[in-house]
């Protein structure tokens, strides 16, 4: 059985690495979308893999991720 929290965490971390975005920059970008948080909280959420689907989508939007490949082709 797949660990969905770890899967979402891995996707988010991979996109952050691909876009070269660290937690403080992600917080700045999230603020532009009206999402208020701090770098420590964001880093902890991502590190634990315990975040909502809304937070996941907000992060992807903040990083301007337009395509996400989920398959294993």
Each predicted region: which residue ranges?
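Residues within the alpha-helical elements of helix-turn-helix
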Residues: 29, 33, 62
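DNA major-groove recognition helix of helix-turn-helix/homeodomain DNA-binding modules
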Residues: 52-70
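A short, Lys/Arg-rich alpha-helix, primarily the initiator
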Residues: 1-29
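Recognition helix of helix-turn-helix/homeodomain-like DNA-binding domains
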Residues: 32-50
């Amino acid at each position: 059985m797949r660990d969905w929290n770890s899967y979402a965490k891995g996707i988010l971390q991979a996109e952050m690495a691909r876009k070269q975005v660290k937690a403080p920059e992600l917080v700045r970008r999230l603020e532009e979308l009206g999402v208020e948080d701090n770098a420590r909280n964001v880093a902890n959420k991502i590190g634990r893999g315990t975040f909502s689907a809304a937070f996941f989508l907000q992060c992807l939007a903040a990083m301007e991720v337009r395509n996400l490949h989920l398959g294993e082709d």
